[in-house]
Amino acid sequence: MSKTKILIFIDWYLPGYKAGGPIQSVANLVAHLKNDFDISIITRDTDYSETTPYSDVKSNKWIISDGIRIYYASKDQLSYSTMHKLIEEESFDYIYLNGIYSLYFTLIPLFILRKKHGKRIVIAARGMLSTGSLNVKKTKKQLFLRMIKMAK
């Protein structure tokens, strides 16, 4: 019997560390689930606030690292068409979106997936919906939340 497939979207992932807690949270989640689930991750090929790609990963292709598949997208590949191709090339049982204010790793995947009935999507808000957080860059966040509702 094949394993349940999970596709994770996260702006920054290992070997990155500058985005802090979210990277470690997802890395820990993956470490605990990878023996029971088939996990794939789509992320950037740079660390937070960096423009130089990681030197030890191959960009724009699926690689296997520690038993999971990872796609490190270069800046020029961050697009609707790339995300659409990656989502469509394989069937996933669950989609995990880490965060809510990311164009490429939340909003675009939601718009692509909105017509796929039966897809189970988990959005990890990670404190981004707290009153204090919502008051910082309020207009931008309200726009994102409206667009997420439209993607239903």
Show the residue positions of the predicted features.
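Structural motif corresponding to alpha-helix initiation and N-cap regions
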Residues: 77-81, 107, 147-150
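Short N-terminal targeting/anchoring amphipathic segment
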Residues: 85-105, 109, 118-122
